Amino acid sequence: RILAPLEPAAGGSLETLLALRTRLPPGQDIVSYSANVFRDWCWGEAECRLAAEAVAAALGAARPQRILVLGAGAGRLAYDLHQRTDAVLTAAVDYNPLLCYVGRAVADGGTIPLVEFPLAPRSPASAAVERTLSAPVPTRPGLEFVMADVMRAPFQPGTFDLVVTPWLLDVVGQPAADVLARINILLGADGRWVHHGSVAFDGPDPAERLTLQELEETAAARGFTDLQASEDWMPYLAS
């Protein structure tokens, strides 16, 4: 058993909580990250390889058996890590149903025809491009896609020995200290956390616009030790 039991939120009736619920940011809809679908499963092979290699380099000789990718998007990094390691479980968590369903279908060996609307088309002819999504090979058993809020990941504490957060910390819209505390809860003894991507915090609260050094200090305050950081240039959504 790795899934935590679902319990009603404390502090009020369901009707009250629904009335007071926080709305999603206006830019967060089902197609907000559709470019990631095409990057992951069509034209972004080199970019995806660099991301997987960066995470693998951070792991060194470690051989995680239970991997959690929070904010997995369309799932290519989770797929690549699962294929590269001998993990018995890799859980790819994202709350976007389009990304989860496409990732599941393609990772299982399916092909999906889908029209891409590029973020910055170079000509009228490239404003809508027919693509075919597919994985290099079907995934081996153990890769699971879970549609859930990363701040409420439905797993028992201590389930994983590796948590990966790709391009997540500075876009999740929550204080970094809270995100890191939740990550730490999900890690078992001697577990590892690897963040891949930017740390360009630019939220409305100036106190949360952390530098890399401040992020490391925040992580240490939330129980992480032996922190190491490296920086490099990598392409991002470079179609």
For every predicted segment, state its role.
Residues 190-199:
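Conserved beta-strand signature within the Rossmann-like core of class I S-adenosyl-L-methionine
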Residues 161-174:
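A short SAM/SAH-binding and catalytic strip from SAM-dependent methyltransferases
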Residues 74-87:
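Conserved SAM-binding loop of SAM-dependent methyltransferases across substrates and taxa
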Residues 148-163:
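A short acidic, Gly/Pro-enriched loop at the edge of an enzyme's catalytic core
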Residues 107-152:
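S-adenosyl-L-methionine
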Residues 1-59:
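Conserved Class I S-adenosyl-L-methionine-dependent methyltransferase catalytic core
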Residues 177-189:
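A short glycine-rich, Lys/Arg-flanked "PGG" loop and its adjoining helix->strand segment in the class I
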Residues 63-73, 91:
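Conserved class I S-adenosyl-L-methionine
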